Design a protein with these regions (language model features):
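Histidine- and/or cysteine-centered catalytic micro-motif in compact active-site loops
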Residues: 1-2, 116-118
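Flexible, glycine-rich terminal cap/loop adjacent to redox cofactors
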Residues: 1-91
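Short hydrophobic-acidic sequence motifs that mark active-site Asp/Glu residues
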Residues: 29-31, 112, 131
Length: 193
């Protein structure tokens, strides 16, 4: 998961990449790996305390952490990561990793939906993606096949989660969210070259 180290509207926000590891059956937190700059130590401390306390991913999404815009966001990256993992743990959202997606590209039963904004598409899209901004998704459902496996992505995963919810509420059953969005896809692509 990618999240800003502090409120996005405050100057100087930098992304951090968080990989949370939990038990599949219980959701108990087992570990974390965070790559970034400012605030990584704070987030590792929070997860270390959660591990010591035997907390689960569902506990993380309910945390109430102190914040000020220069140092954190109202929805701290650890809380957002807890929400993402909880959605997956409860079966509310299936995810797909960049490596898993790469293996499926070219499959005629796969439709890839990029819900980023047009100005973000200039930096490139994943080959074969159908580009529909999140704000226009409801009006463009007829461009998509609800019977195909559908992978939704955005820059980091938040908008694609909302896009997946819209699609699910409109009868799409086989939905997956690209973990880490186009940011993680870019990192994966670089690692393969």
């Amino acid at each position: 998961n990618f999240h800003g180290d502090h409120a996005g509207y405050y100057p100087g926000a930098e992304n951090m990449m968080i990989k949370l590891i939990s038990e599949k059956d219980s959701g108990r937190i087992l570990g974390v790996q965070i790559v970034g700059g400012n605030g990584v130590d704070k987030r590792v401390d929070v997860v270390a305390t959660a591990i010591y306390g035997g907390m689960t991913v569902e506990d993380l999404e309910s945390l109430d952490l102190a914040y000020a815009p220069p140092f954190g966001a109202a929805k701290d990256p650890i809380i957002m990561t807890g929400m993402n993992h909880s959605n997956s743990f409860r079966g509310e959202m299936d995810t797909i990793t960049p490596a898993e997606l790469a293996a499926k590209l070219g499959d005629s039963n796969l439709q890839l939906v990029d819900v980023r904004n047009p100005n973000e598409w200039k930096a490139g899209t994943i080959e074969g993606a159908i580009t529909i901004p999140l704000d226009d998704l409801r009006q463009n459902l007829d461009q998509l096949d609800p019977n195909k496996e559908t992978v939704v992505y955005c820059r980091s995963g938040q908008r694609s989660y909302f896009g997946s919810c819209i699609l699910r509420n409109n009868g799409f059953k086989n939905l997956r969210n690209l973990t880490g969005g186009s940011l993680s896809w870019g990192i994966y692509q670089k690692s393969q070259s």
